[in-house]
Structure formats: structure tokens, C-alpha cells
Amino acid sequence: MGRERLHTVAIVPAAGLGLRMGGAVPKQFRPLGGLPLLVYSLRVFQSSPVIDAVILAVPEAELRYCQTDIVDAHGFTKVAHIVPGGRERQDSVRHALGVLDERVDLVVIHDAVRPCVTEAMVSQVVDAAAADGAAIIALPMRDTVKQVGGDRVIERTIDRKPLWLAQTPQAFRRDWLEEAHRKAQAEGMAATDDAYLLEWMGRPVRVIEGSGENIKVTRPEDLVIGEAILASRTGRRP
């Protein structure tokens, strides 16, 4: 398929509770530089020339808040649907797939808690998926990796050369992704990311080297790091 014929939608699963962050507010809505963390990813998709629409999957109790305080307040006109998320991330993605327009060719999945994603990352992964069917942003492992037993004693050192840390965005042919989610639901397969499902189906997934700045906010200290990264790009507070 030529790039000009591809209709691409981004799905942002944002229904997690963020238990490791603590507190009553889910981490995707925590303030970062004065704005809800989720806003930063949506800004990138709003301005990206390769994204035609966005679907959010959020906690059911936050549907109104997301519509009024995030989508409407920040002018995110590309957000076409806000759907209730599921218990697991995989459920949230499946719910979002259920409202896709029939015109959609490619689907981009991005973690709501990766606020430092860039337009370049989105374009790279979309172009790779357009060519190969599936692609993800990832980082080569640079630290020494130890396999540790239940008693916290090192069992062995693992060769890090073939190891990469998966990030998002991840992009897939719509038909491949839908097929993988249907089969996973039918067989009770649980995956930690969508690329895992494609691997499980025997589909090739291309890897695009990303950036260490594309952090996933999971702990309070990550908010400080994320704010510093965003500030460094603008020369001021994000």
C-alpha cells in the first residue's frame, strides 16, 4: 500500500490506575508542568501529519472529564472517540478497535504515560508499518542483564546483544491487529503489549531505534524526569 492511500488512527489506552504511583489520581491525569500528563501525547498526535484521528480509552468514571477538561479544553479535534477502557490494557485496546472507521488501514498504539514521544517517532513507526505491516519503537539494551532466582541470588548473566526494550508508539496493519486481538480473546492469551500479540501470531515486527527520552512514567520521580526532558526541548517549563 502506498503511503498516500493509508488512513491511520492512533489508539491511546489511558485506563490504567497507576498503582505504583500512589495517590488517588490515575497517573495519566497527574500534572506534569501544569498540564495533565495525557495532554502531551495528544499534542503530538494532533500535530502529526501522518495521524488522521485518535481514539482514547479511559476509565468509565473519567469519560466526561476527558471530554471537557482534556479534549475540548485543549482543542484536540482529531479525537474522534472516547471509549470506556477495560480491566487490562489489552481490553482497552480491543474496546477502541471496536469503534474504528472502516476506512482505517493502519493503527498506532501509544502509552498515555509516555509524554515525551515526538512527531518523528510517530512518522518513523508509521512509515515502517506501511512498508512491513508492523513496527515498534524500541531501545537496545545497554545495561548488563542478570537472571535472578527466587532467593535474589544471580543465576546467570544474559547476553544483552539481541535484547531490546520495547516502547511505544507501535504501528500495525489494521487487519493484522484485529485478527490478533480476536484470537487472543478467544484463547485467553494475555500480552503486555500489542507487538507481543503479533509475534504470537507469527507476524514479523520491525524495530525502529527510539530514544532514552521516551520514558514511561510509572513512579513519582519519573514526573520530574519527564518535566526536565520537555523543558529542555523548549528552553522553558513545558
Predicted regions and their residues:
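SAM-dependent methyltransferases
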Residues: M1-I11, A15, D193-D194, G212-N214, ...
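N-terminal glycine-rich phosphate-binding loop and ensuing alpha1 helix
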Residues: R3-L63
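Short, conserved active-site loop motifs that form the nucleotide-linked donor/cofactor pocket
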Residues: T8, V79-A80, L163
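Structural beta-sheet core signal
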Residues: A10-V12, L56, I109, A134-I137
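Residue-level signal for inorganic ion chemistry
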Residues: V12, F29, L38, A96, ...
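Acidic helix N-cap motif at the loop->helix transition within catalytic regions
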Residues: R64-I70
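Short phosphate-binding loop-to-helix
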Residues: V71-L106
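Conserved core of the sugar-phosphate nucleotidyltransferase
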Residues: C116-I208, P238
